[in-house]
Amino acid sequence: AELNTIGEKIFKNEAGGIKKDLVYWNKGENFPSLGIGHFIWYKQGEPGIFEESFPQLVEFLKSKNVKLPKIMAENKYSPWKDRQELINLKTKKNPDIEELTNFLYDNKDLQIMFIFKRLEASLEKMMAVSSNKENVRKQFYRVASSPNGLYPLIDYVNFKGEGTNPKERYKEQGWGLLQVLENMKGAETGKATLTEFSNSAKFVLQRRVNNSDPSKNERKWLQGWFNRCNTYAE
């Protein structure tokens, strides 16, 4: 039950809780974002520094023997050439897009299971690359064992990734879950833990924006990102 509650929160964070925004393409990005976790899906040959997660979701759903909608079943890569094409198809209520949207809306529980599995796998990946393994493990379990502590971990790993991909760096500094945990120092559990996690996430995201190429104007996202981090301490 806790996972389903978390799933609804992530749906709200990523897609504003709006069904049609389960199939989305952000302005200025070279990929669409799909599902409750706004999973990234690249076109064939599209270079991307952000971790792609939609193909893994498709594989996970296949392993559960779920009947996939046409777009997911027939395309290894994102089938739309650009944002405008996807917007046009959505506006025309294209049946394949409608089918995809309905599927993603009706199968929120499977998507949250997928995100949870990603979280479980992430600790090993983070410890493999961290220079301070013990602190990472300690902080991970410190957050996980706090009341409502699974939500921040699951949401953040879905929101900004594990932080283990060397390509996901600006000026050699990452912004994933690993960097948030590495930046934490405390030992007490409970509310204080979640407040520290929330503040650490904001610190890492502020640093990302400071290190980013100003022409990308990432600053425009920051307030929304901070609002999301505030939900971790609630």
Label every model-predicted segment.
Residues A1-E234:
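Cell-wall polysaccharide-cleaving catalytic domain and substrate-binding groove, primarily
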